[in-house]
Amino acid sequence: MKIRAIIVLALIVCGIVSTIFYVKANQVSTNEKAIIEAIQTKNTPALIQALITRMKNQLEKDVNTFPELIKEVETYAGTCPDSASVAILHSMIAEMYNNYYMQNRWNVNQRTELAGYVPDDIREWTSNLFREKIKQELTLSLQPARLLQQTPISQYNLILKKGKDAPQLRPTLYDFLAFRAIDIQ
């Protein structure tokens, strides 16, 4: 009787695990479709949302892919035609560099600072390189200032988690990104 109970329990656990893997695999393919659709329809808020979802899913599988994900977002920022969305992507990139630095701070701070040379792989960077890159990305996230000041934050409701006072405190994209830059630094 105990053997049957163990076998039944093992089958149930296997069924649950396989269901979880199936759901995760389906989410990934759905997410890839969302990225392709957002690119085709030039819906940059949807593209940014799909990128965020894909990055979260990828990081759940393998934390070591973080540098590659940063490069991917940099590629999207370099090819995106919408200046306001490019500013958001630069803000995301700054946050990603900051998060990577914070997660690896102990190792990074043990290295001798580099001057005049920037390794391609951020796993080899020193603290001064991270600080400079984060500052550069935050500066880019606030440009073009005039356009960002005229862009209502409501255009990006899809990707924002706002509190009830957000429209009064940060009515434009520039306000939002400026507060975000302060938080990141």
How would you name each of these model-derived features?
Residues 1-11, 23:
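N-terminal Sec-pathway targeting helices
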Residues 22-23, 103:
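Transmembrane helix-loop junctions and nearby membrane-interface residues
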Residues 31-185:
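Extracytoplasmic/secretory-pathway proteins
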